Amino acid sequence: ELYPVDAHAAPMAASSHVAAVPESGEELATQCQTLMENLLALSGFDRVLYYRFMPEGDGEVLAEARREGVTGSYQGLRFPASDIPYIARQLYLKNPWRTIPDATAAPVPIYAAQAGATPDLSFVDLRSASPVHLEYMANMGVGGAISLPIIQGGELDALISCHVAAPKQLTVSQLDSMRALSEGFNLRLRDFKARRRQQVIDGLQRHFDHAKTVLMRHGELESAWEELSDWLMETFAADGVMLQMGEEYYQHGVGLTPHVMSMVAQQAAAEATHVWLSDSLQRDCPGMPLSEVAGVALISDLPLDQHHTVNLYLCRVEHIYDVTWGGN
């Protein structure tokens, strides 16, 4: 590609600050906001957004930085999955950025050397955008844009989207500096998630050490269940708890039928995990019948009994919340 170069591009100061892996969700949010502000300064754009994808594919703006004088905020708004089609999301997994320096530029056709062949533009940085996306940008008052992917576990976790009202071309070195900042945050986010998961596992171990103590005090599960189930409900803020020990089932509060418990266990086994979480059983467990239980946490193979397989199901009912959608 013959990339446009501005011989007099403004110098960019490289950040010498190396942030530590955040210790809390609040610190992670602060680092995300700082990233938005740094990218805004580096790019000279009008607005930078952190757009995280939800499990259903919709996206929500979690952080935003705006140039002084730019009005209107997208923070907290949610946008439908169709705004960023599947094929576009796959391209973000292959490329360090996507840039549209001028949304009003007339596209120039590219022809393959071999007659009748279609050139693969997957890694072409200067390819044009689809007419639908260009109309989308025009409706937002955006003349130029840059997007940087946040990839976690091989999946597109979020997009950093930079907008400017008038067409604006950045140099490759400028884009690479922005990429380095976003990748640094990406690595810290990965380590933060890994640390949080380990903390959850360690916390579960401490909790079930307490459960063992309760069982030992009562001598058998049947007599310990009332105290144990109350403690589990309070500790995990659950609406119901079920314990499966071999062929026996114990329940307190809302619960699942043995058939549904088996379906959940099979889904967890298919994903090869001992801690399986879902905030929507209808979405995450195919063929799930309707019930008052909307979400469940399954902790399988608990070390509570050396003679039986022990699985714990923590259930929650439906939680209603408001979603603010962007657009009309």
Descriptions of predicted regions:
Residues 1-14, 40-62:
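Hydrophobic or amphipathic alpha-helical targeting/insertion segments
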Residues 1-6, 66-67, 151, 158-169, ...:
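Short beta-strand-to-loop transition segments that serve as allosteric relay/switch motifs
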Residues 13, 34, 161, 170-190, ...:
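Amphipathic alpha-helical "output/dimerization" segments
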Residues 18-47, 190-256:
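Signal-transducing coiled-coil/dimerization helices and immediately adjacent hinge/linker segments
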Residues 51-111, 244-266, 282:
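GAF sensory/regulatory domain recognition
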Residues 105-142, 280-298, 318-328:
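Signal-transducing coupling segments at domain and membrane junctions
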Residues 130-131, 253-293:
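A charged amphipathic helix-loop-strand protein-protein interaction module that recurs
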Residues 143-151, 296-303, 307:
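Short hydrophobic beta-strand micro-motif common in sensory/regulatory domains
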